[in-house]
């Protein structure tokens, strides 16, 4: 590889790889030490973005109105924003929070064909969809024989698709996986085969729920909204309490062919890399500086609301700082965050009313 190619593209070509065209030179006399290397890459033209600047992305956000920016994000993940209400657009943004917020746990139950799997499969190569069969602890965490780290240790987002399904090929977790996943969702680390491993991977539980499609609400033959989950999960309050947000998938419309994007959005590879860089930024500082939560709220509820709020800030207001973010911008993110966590808490109260008593979830904005 020539010095120029190595300098400009070496960090990408020698790690994750990149699509592009290469000019390869044949020189049988080219040596490195005592070894001949007759084939040498002398030029490379990438098809995709190989270098990007998060600061440039943040600077360009300032040129858009909030509504136009949200529409751009919706278009980027493959949907036509003109076909959706503001509420549906906001729920699509919530689907993106696991991509920008590390160690984030989301559940979405809703009818089929609402674009859940489509979005997760097409947004980033660093997401992995467990779409069928039983997911074992070896596959997810660590393989004791091969010594390979599992997908939760390798990916940014792991999606358990069709968790709430009676189909034979639905995603299922064995007992060992549930115990390990429960600890991981709380701590961001896990022990497997005598090895302690950490990860920033976010977890998404996705599945179906019986829905009144016309009125966009679940059918009321459920005792609680976790009931469609597999038997081993549906009333495991320790597991369910680790979920940061419950996205009401029954509010999402069935996606028609005309609902897919037809205009301009960000290149998917570029957007995926930006999301990955945003994962490394801490936007919870915005909330610590400007928000107070009511006394009596559990630490898990507090953490859940902060993580959802921070994720939405990264998506919609990445250009804001704790000093210049507007109250209405904070309210937009936190109202959604409180609603999504409240849905989790209400189901826990229905499952175990003695363990989970009613507590007010909310927030108060304070002056700069």
Feature map (PLM): residue ranges:
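Conserved ASCE/P-loop NTPase catalytic core
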Residues: 80-215, 220-227, 241, 362
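C-terminal helical "lid" subdomain and adjoining coupling/linker elements of P-loop NTPases
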Residues: 255-259, 285-358
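Eukaryote-specific, cytoplasm-facing alpha-helical/coiled-coil scaffolding segments in long proteins
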Residues: 122, 269-272, 335-342
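Conserved phosphate/pyrophosphate-binding and hydrolysis machinery centered on Walker-type P-loop NTPases
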Residues: 59, 63, 85-89, 260-264, ...
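Extended, charged/polar low-complexity intrinsically disordered regions
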Residues: 1-76
